[in-house]
Amino acid sequence: MDEKKIVYDVVLSVWNLAKEHGFEKLTDEQWDSLVEKATIERDKFKQHGENIDLLFRQMYMALQNYYERK
C-alpha cells in the first residue's frame, strides 16, 4: 500500500475517533470506548512499521490530551 494512503488513513482514523466521541468532556464509559477503539485502530497500523505506528500513537496521544483538558 502507498505510504501516502497509509498516513491519510491514520489521520482519518484519529479524526473518526474524535468525531465519534464528540468534542465535550468524556464520561468514563466514553473514555473506555475511546481507548478500546483506539487499540483496535492501532493494531491495524502496527503492521506498516514503526514510523506509522508512532504517527498513530502520537496523534492519538494528542487526542487524549485534548479530552483531558476539557
Where in the sequence are the language-model features?
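Secondary-structure edge/capping motif, primarily at the C-terminal ends of alpha-helices
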Residues: A18-K25, F45-H48, K70
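Short, charged, amphipathic alpha-helical segments
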Residues: D28-E36, L54-R57
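Short, charged early-sequence alpha-helical segments and their helix-coil boundaries
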Residues: D43-R69
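Amphipathic alpha-helices that form helix-helix packing interfaces
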Residues: V7-V10, V14-L17, L34-K37, E41, ...
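N-terminal acidic leader/helix
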Residues: M1-D28
